[in-house]
């Protein structure tokens, strides 16, 4: 998922997903779903992640609001079921209701068979998605790891203390 999902005029959401899913299934040695199976799966996943059915036939992200684009990405995750998903600042620009819906979708998709790397600059998203781990990147490296409490500490103190700690470690090496 992208911070700013791109629009692809002329490619419907449903055709994009049908093609992507067929390629994934072919890679796994599985036959493509027939039209009835695909539409049934699509309806199930739309319901699961609270995705507006009228968006599936529109061009991919074209004219979508920021929240609709993010919800569309969660719908894509539901349909494609990747084992690893990277959500790059998926909370960027979302109003609180959209943030709740997107977070609920991510939580419904979490399982022991997949992993999510969620990149965020704010603790707010973590009120809805409780992470197993929190890692702080600075200057291209992980400088601190912890639990949700680390995110709360960052919200309270900011990042400067970690930057200083990171510089001190770099000079002692």
Language model features with spans:
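Conserved D-loop-proximal element of ABC-family nucleotide-binding domains
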Residues: 95-100, 145
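Helical segment within the ABC ATPase nucleotide-binding domain
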Residues: 99-112
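Conserved H-loop
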Residues: 113-129
């Amino acid at each position: 998922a992208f911070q700013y999902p791109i629009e692809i005029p002329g490619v419907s959401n449903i055709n994009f997903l049908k093609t992507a899913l067929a390629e994934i299934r072919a890679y796994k040695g599985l036959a493509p779903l027939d039209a009835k199976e695909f539409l049934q799966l699509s309806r199930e996943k739309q319901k699961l992640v609270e995705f507006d059915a009228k968006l599936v036939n529109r061009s991919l992200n074209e004219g979508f609001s920021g929240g609709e684009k993010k919800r569309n990405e969660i719908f894509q995750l539901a349909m494609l079921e990747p084992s690893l998903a990277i959500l790059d600042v998926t909370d960027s620009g979302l109003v609180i209701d959209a943030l709740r819906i997107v977070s609920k979708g991510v939580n419904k998709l979490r399982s022991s068979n997949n992993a999510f790397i969620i990149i965020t600059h704010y603790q707010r998203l973590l009120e809805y998605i409780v992470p197993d781990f929190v890692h702080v990147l600075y200057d291209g490296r992980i400088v601190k790891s912890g639990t949700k409490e680390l995110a709360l500490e960052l919200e309270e103190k900011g990042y400067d203390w970690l930057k200083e700690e990171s510089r001190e470690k770099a000079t002692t090496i």
